[in-house]
C-alpha cells in the first residue's frame, strides 16, 4: 500500500506467503485504457509480458504507467477494470499503517486487508 500511488494485491496470503499462479499473460496495455485513479491494472516484473495474479488499484493519476510504445520501457501496465462503487473503501485502505512484512521491507499492511468480493459489471 503506497498512498497517492497504488494498492497492490493478489500474489500473497495474509501471512505474506507467495500464492501459486498460472502462466504469464501477454501485455495488453495498448488497449487505450489509462492508469487513472480508481482503475485496476495488472502488476508485473520488468518483463512486459510477466503478469500473472497480482493487480493494483491506482489511487492517483499514474500516467507514467501507461502504454506509450511496444518497447521495454514503453509497454506500460494493462488496465482491465475500474472501481465503480467503494472508492471510499479504497481511500481507507490507502491510509492503513504499513511497514515491513514477509519479503517486503516496507509498504506492507500491518493488519490484513482482504478484498472479500468483486463483481464483473460488463465485458
Predicted feature descriptions by range:
Residues 1-123:
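Cyclophilin-like peptidyl-prolyl cis-trans isomerases
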Amino acid at each position: 500500500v503506497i498512498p497517492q500511488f497504488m494498492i497492490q494485491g493478489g500474489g500473497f496470503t495474509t501471512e505474506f506467503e507467495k500464492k501459486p499462479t498460472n502462466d504469464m499473460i501477454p501485455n495488453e496495455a495498448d488497449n487505450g485504457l489509462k492508469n487513472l485513479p480508481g482503475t485496476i491494472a495488472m502488476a508485473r516484473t520488468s518483463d512486459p509480458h510477466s503478469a500473472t495474479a497480482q493487480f493494483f488499484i491506482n489511487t492517483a493519476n499514474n500516467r507514467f504507467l501507461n502504454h506509450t510504445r511496444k518497447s521495454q520501457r514503453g509497454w506500460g501496465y494493462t488496465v482491465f477494470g475500474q472501481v465503480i462503487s467503494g472508492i471510499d473503501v479504497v481511500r481507507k485502505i490507502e491510509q492503513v499503517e504499513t511497514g515491513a512484512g514477509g519479503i517486503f521491507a516496507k509498504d506492507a499492511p500491518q493488519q490484513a486487508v482482504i478484498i472479500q468480493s468483486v463483481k464483473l459489471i460488463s465485458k
